[in-house]
């Protein structure tokens, strides 16, 4: 019999909460038979949504507060002790849940993950990790970290992001020897500012890392790396540029095809299946969420606008993280390589 896991779900976090969160949780419950899902939030509203559905492997924990999307993160976490997010996070810390899911305030979830669940000993700064597709081969997914948690970094942070991303690629994406690259403004070894030049040397000499150099943002979707390491500012800017370009491109193309000549419309009908397939490659609803990597348990954030399908997919992502022993293996590796994790290149 498969080992069972309990996932704490912030049912009140997100633009479409609690409706889509509860629907997604029920989809995941039916799909993944070894998961128990604890929903934290307004019990009355959650019960209304569940209706006559059996509550098998579903538990509802009532909370009286919620953290809004626009609230100041750290202040909200400190003040709203009975919010769905904070109570769910404390359940993970206390051991009554194995992992945490939320579609709520990203900053608040970061604060909850870092200050309540806690950093893995030896990891200086946890970061946000996401998985993106390669356009030439949608099945070849790649890890991108950091995408927004740490705008300012040290070389050692970037090195640790590479280690965390490498573990995610091997454990969750099942890549045997992930190719690691550093996001930079050129491919040459001496490109970038002092931090990136020093980080390059750390990565180049890193133990058990298949580091193959720098990568420019224009190459991110071309399948040239399995793990891309970035500071949070550059990573977030690149991620939003990718998302924005995809949305703009498809909106512009749709406008041209709809308002074009008869020949254009006939052509549009012919290419529609191919365009639909390509758009699904870049559709975040088909993916999971962003992982707060470097904390003591899986903490995963999906888009605030997530629908039930995305919620279910993200819970499936957490399931793989738990079953692959991702966090315990990272913890063990960092503990066994403490000296390596203290390395910071001297300023030249």
UniProtKB/Swiss-Prot annotation:
Metabolic or biological pathway: Lipid metabolism; phospholipid metabolism
UniProt keyword annotations, A-Z: Cytoplasm, Lipid biosynthesis, Lipid metabolism, Phospholipid biosynthesis, Phospholipid metabolism, Transferase
Single GO BP term: phospholipid biosynthetic process
GO molecular function: phosphate:acyl-[acyl carrier protein] acyltransferase activity
Top class in the EC scheme: transferase
Superkingdom of this protein's organism: Bacteria
Locations listed in the record: Cytoplasm
EC number: 2.3.1.274
Matching Pfam families: FA_synthesis (PF02504)
Catalysis: reaction(s): a fatty acyl-[ACP] + phosphate = an acyl phosphate + holo-[ACP]
Keyword set includes Heme: no
Any single Gene Ontology cellular-component annotation: cytoplasm
HAMAP family (UniProt xref): PlsX
Known function: Catalyzes the reversible formation of acyl-phosphate (acyl-PO(4)) from acyl-[acyl-carrier-protein] (acyl-ACP). This enzyme utilizes acyl-ACP as fatty acyl donor, but not acyl-CoA.
UniProt family annotation: Belongs to the PlsX family.
NCBIfam families: plsX (TIGR00182)
Description of how the protein assembles with itself and partners: Homodimer. Probably interacts with PlsY.
Protein name: Phosphate acyltransferase
Organism: Oenococcus oeni (strain ATCC BAA-331 / PSU-1)
């Amino acid at each position: 019999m498969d080992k069972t896991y309990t996932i704490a779900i912030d049912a009140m976090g997100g633009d479409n909460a609690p409706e889509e969160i509860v629907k997604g949780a029920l989809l995941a419950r039916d799909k993944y038979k070894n998961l128990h899902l604890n929903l934290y939030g307004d019990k009355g509203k959650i019960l209304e949504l569940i209706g006559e559905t059996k509550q098998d492997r579903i538990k509802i924990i009532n909370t009286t507060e919620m953290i809004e999307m626009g609230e100041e993160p750290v202040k909200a976490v400190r003040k709203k002790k009975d919010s769905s997010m904070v109570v769910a996070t404390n359940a993970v810390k206390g051991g009554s849940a194995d992992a945490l899911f939320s579609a709520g305030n990203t900053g608040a979830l970061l604060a909850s993950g870092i200050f309540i669940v806690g950093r893995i000993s030896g990891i200086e700064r946890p970061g946000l990790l996401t998985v993106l597709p390669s356009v030439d081969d949608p099945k070849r997914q790649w890890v991108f970290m950091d995408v927004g948690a740490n705008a300012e970094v040290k070389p050692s942070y970037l090195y640790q992001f590479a280690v965390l991303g490498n573990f995610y690629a091997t454990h969750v994406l099942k890549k045997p020897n992930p190719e690691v690259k550093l996001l930079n403004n050129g491919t040459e070894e001496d490109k970038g500012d002092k931090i990136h030049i020093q980080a390059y040397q750390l990565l180049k000499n890193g133990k058990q890392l298949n580091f193959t150099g720098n990568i420019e943002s224009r190459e991110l979707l071309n399948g040239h790396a399995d793990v891309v390491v970035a500071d949070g500012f550059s990573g977030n800017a690149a991620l939003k540029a990718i998302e924005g370009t995809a949305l703009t491109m498809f909106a512009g193309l749709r406008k041209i095809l709809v308002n074009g000549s008869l020949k254009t419309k006939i052509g549009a009908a012919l290419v529609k299946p191919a365009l639909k397939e390509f758009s699904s490659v870049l559709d975040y609803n088909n993916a999971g969420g962003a992982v707060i990597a470097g904390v003591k348990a899986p903490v995963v954030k999906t888009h605030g606008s997530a629908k039930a399908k995305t919620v279910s997919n993200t819970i499936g992502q957490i399931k793989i993280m738990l079953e692959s022993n991702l966090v315990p293996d990272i913890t063990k590796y960092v503990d066994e390589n403490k000296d390596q994790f203290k390395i910071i290149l001297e300023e030249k």
